[in-house]
Regions:
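Rossmann-like dinucleotide/flavin-binding elements
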Residues: 20-54, 58, 94-105, 115-129, ...
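Generic structural "secondary-structure junction" signal
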Residues: 6, 60, 64, 70, ...
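C-terminal catalytic ATP-binding subdomain
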Residues: 1-5, 85, 111
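N-terminal Rossmann-like dinucleotide/flavin-binding domain of flavoprotein oxidoreductases
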Residues: 60-110, 126, 188
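Proline-rich low-complexity regions
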Residues: 1-4, 33, 69
Length: 188
């Protein structure tokens, strides 16, 4: 987010998009918030853009998080960008298109933007802990998405270890508690 990050101090204004300087095409891999924004900005500059998404829907983890109680407004991040992308003739969108390095090389573009997201750690390493929690290999450990999607498989109390101390752990705890799953909430 150039406005929030104060990139404007270096002359990077998100409202004043400079036109393209070359006729090269661009490939954006991944359609989470960063991939969508990258695609929109490149297209606004006039580039021919190909957006490749491994899943059948655009939006990445925002689709998951916006489905949780209290976070539905977050979907506008996806909706607004997807709407603009679908209106532009200089953007091609390919869903269900998981690309390997070989695929990307075969594509023949010089400008490649990887916006493939990240994965949750399941070893206990986080903001305050720099070493894995011993013994986790002997118990079932879920990511936030896995806990929500597989809640019927959860037997007994579930410990939510919140080392980020942000919004998501509390929202996941509330969601699971509403599904009658006993939650023990731990913050370091």
């Amino acid at each position: 987010n150039p406005t929030m990050g104060e990139e404007w101090r270096r002359g990077w204004d998100p409202e004043n998009i400079k036109p393209k300087v070359t006729d090269q095409r661009a490939l954006v891999v991944g359609s989470g918030p960063s991939g969508l924004e990258c695609t929109v900005q490149l297209a606004r500059r006039g580039y021919q853009v190909v957006l490749a998404e491994a899943e059948d829907k655009l939006g990445g983890r925002v689709l998951f998080e916006s489905s949780l109680k209290g976070l539905s407004a977050w979907k506008r991040v996806v909706d607004n960008r997807v709407h603009e992308i679908l209106q532009k003739s200089n953007i091609e969108v390919y869903k269900e298109s998981r690309l390997t390095a070989e695929h990307i090389n075969e594509f023949g573009v010089n400008n490649i933007f990887l916006a493939t997201g990240s994965n949750w750690r399941k070893d206990g390493i986080g903001r305050s802990r720099r070493a894995p929690i011993q013994g986790l290999e002997s118990v079932k450990v879920y990511s936030p998405e896995e806990a929500i999607q597989n809640y019927k498989d959860i037997k007994g109390p579930l410990v939510i270890y919140d080392d980020e101390q942000g919004y998501l752990a509390g929202v996941v705890a509330d969601h699971l508690n509403a599904k009658n799953i006993e939650v023990v909430f731990v913050t370091p």
